[in-house]
């Protein structure tokens, strides 16, 4: 019994001693920590700088790194500005190159730059001695024989199509009855199915002059083909007219496919898309300022490929960029949409390479960051500016027609008007269509309208150079001359 009590007391004393010892250790640690903190406090009170020395050093390091980063950032900004300046200078140089007249362009840029690139010798066999005094661009064009007539043997002109924007031809009285139909029903159907503005018949004493009103050469070609089909057959009705229109559309489309395929394959460009062949073939019947678009595309393609070869770029890709840059002009129903937008859509449809897509969409832009597009842009300007490429008479005729259209729209603003300018600009025909079915014109109103048109034509510096016979048709025909 006593032994058990003794053991219990000993065990209790051991446990109590252990906890007491642990407690003393904790108290001693806290006292040491307090003493250290108090010592640090005394040092800080006496010398704060010494106490914060470590923090100051770290701060200086951070500040130094920040300054270094700021310096590097300034260098990067300066480099970026220099690059932007160089890019701007390059753009200005290229803009001057593209916008200068052809002679200045060559004298200031192409003549020296291309010579330096290819290191041409004046005695080189590439250019004969008789042309040594010619500008370099002339030698370049002569050497590569630019122009569709020399590049490929293909007839791209229709003899019935003239440069005044509307086919005009004579037919007999019986053919007139066939084309016009009873009360003009055949003519109305033709206009509707061919999607042209109008077909106008002018009585010339037992013969009729036919004028197809459309500014689309493609629609003009289809109309002429349809008229030929009608005149070759004795009997015509609505069903046959629709059939003739379909035949003309099919024949014309197949003809354009053949043109496109033959030209592309002659250039070793083998594309299986018949739709692309068709669009490319359409360019043979499109004109821009008197210049055939197919001819212009071929010139641009060959010049782009040659320039690319001189600076060791991909000539084949450059050829395709130049060849297809105006493919958007093939679309006859794009309305007011730019040919670059239409062309970009076609490029996506045909899954053309990215460089070609970019060139088609951007070759008229001022800022270009694609080398192939820039070369195509230069070649495009060279082809358009080449002497004889664009007809001055065609430009003047278009300018005259635009001015006369403005005068007519300004003077006769209450009517829908259609005009046809023929005889090299010396005969203007105006068709009036009332916007309101109940709107009628008296003889006095017609005469007043005539006097206004005559006065506007007389005071316009573009339209008053020579007499113009103006014919107004509204239920009856009224004609007058602008000069006696």
From Swiss-Prot:
Domain HD: 293-385
Entry's localization field: Cell membrane
GO MF assignments: RNA binding; RNA endonuclease activity
EC number: 3.1.-.-
Keyword check for Oxidoreductase: no
Classification via CDD domains: HDc (cd00077)
Keywords: Cell membrane, Endonuclease, Hydrolase, Membrane, Nuclease, RNA-binding, Transmembrane, Transmembrane helix
Claim: Coiled coil is one of the keywords in the record: no
Membrane spanning stretches: 18-38
InterPro entries xref list: HD/PDEase_dom, HD_domain, HDIG_dom, Ribonuclease_Y, RNase_Y/CdgJ
Its membrane topology: Single-pass membrane protein
Domain of life: Bacteria
Residue span, KH domain: 166-234
A biological process term (GO) from this entry: mRNA catabolic process
Gene3D superfamilies xrefs: Hypothetical protein af1432
Gene Ontology CC annotations of this record: plasma membrane
Role: Endoribonuclease that initiates mRNA decay.
Assigned protein family: Belongs to the RNase Y family.
PANTHER family: PTHR33525, RIBONUCLEASE Y
Name the UniProt record assigns to this protein: Ribonuclease Y
Organism of origin: Mycoplasma genitalium (strain ATCC 33530 / DSM 19775 / NCTC 10195 / G37) (Mycoplasmoides genitalium)
């Amino acid at each position: 019994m006593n032994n058990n009590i003794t053991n219990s007391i000993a065990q209790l004393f051991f446990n109590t001693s252990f906890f007491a010892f642990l407690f003393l250790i904790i108290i001693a640690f806290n006292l040491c920590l307090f003493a250290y903190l108090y010592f640090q406090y005394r040092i800080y009170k006496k010398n704060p700088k010494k106490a914060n020395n470590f923090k100051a050093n770290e701060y200086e390091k951070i500040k130094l790194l920040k300054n270094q980063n700021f310096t590097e950032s300034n260098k990067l900004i300066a480099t970026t500005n220099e690059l932007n300046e160089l890019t701007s200078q390059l753009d200005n140089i290229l803009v001057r190159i593209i916008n200068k007249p052809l002679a200045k362009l060559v004298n200031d840029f192409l003549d020296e730059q291309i010579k330096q690139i290819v290191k041409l010798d004046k005695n080189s066999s590439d250019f004969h001695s008789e042309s040594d005094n010619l500008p370099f661009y002339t030698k370049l064009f002569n050497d590569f024989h630019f122009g569709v007539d020399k590049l490929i043997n293909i007839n791209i002109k229709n003899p019935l199509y003239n440069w005044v924007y509307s086919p005009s031809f004579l037919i007999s009285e019986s053919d007139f009855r066939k084309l016009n139909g009873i009360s003009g029903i055949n003519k109305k159907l033709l206009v509707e199915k061919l999607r042209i503005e109008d077909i106008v018949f002018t009585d010339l004493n037992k013969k009729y002059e036919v004028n197809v009103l459309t500014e689309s050469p493609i629609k003009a070609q289809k109309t002429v083909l349809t008229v030929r089909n009608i005149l070759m057959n004795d009997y015509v009705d609505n069903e046959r007219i629709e059939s003739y229109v379909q035949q003309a559309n099919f024949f014309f489309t197949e003809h354009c496919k053949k043109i496109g395929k033959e030209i592309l394959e002659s250039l070793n460009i083998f594309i299986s898309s018949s739709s692309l062949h068709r669009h490319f073939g359409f360019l043979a019947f499109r004109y821009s300022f008197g210049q055939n678009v197919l001819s212009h595309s071929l010139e641009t393609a060959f010049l782009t490929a040659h320039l690319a070869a001189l600076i060791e770029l991909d000539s084949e890709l450059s050829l395709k960029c130049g060849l297809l840059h105006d493919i958007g002009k093939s679309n006859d129903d794009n309305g007011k949409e730019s040919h670059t937008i239409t062309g970009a859509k076609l490029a996506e449809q045909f899954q053309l390479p990215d460089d070609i897509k970019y060139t088609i969409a951007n070759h008229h832009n001022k800022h270009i960051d694609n080398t192939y597009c820039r070369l195509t842009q230069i070649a495009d300007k060279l082809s358009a500016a080449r002497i004889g490429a664009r007809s001055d008479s065609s430009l003047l005729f278009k300018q005259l027609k635009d001015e006369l259209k403005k005068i007519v729209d300004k003077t006769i603003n209450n009517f829908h008007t259609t005009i046809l300018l023929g005889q090299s600009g010396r005969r203007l025909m105006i068709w009036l269509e009332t916007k309101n079915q109940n709107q009628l014109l008296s003889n006095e109103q017609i005469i007043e309208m005539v006097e206004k048109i005559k006065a506007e034509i007389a005071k316009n510096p573009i339209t008053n150079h020579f007499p113009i016979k103006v014919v107004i048709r509204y239920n009856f025909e009224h004609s007058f001359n602008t000069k006696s």
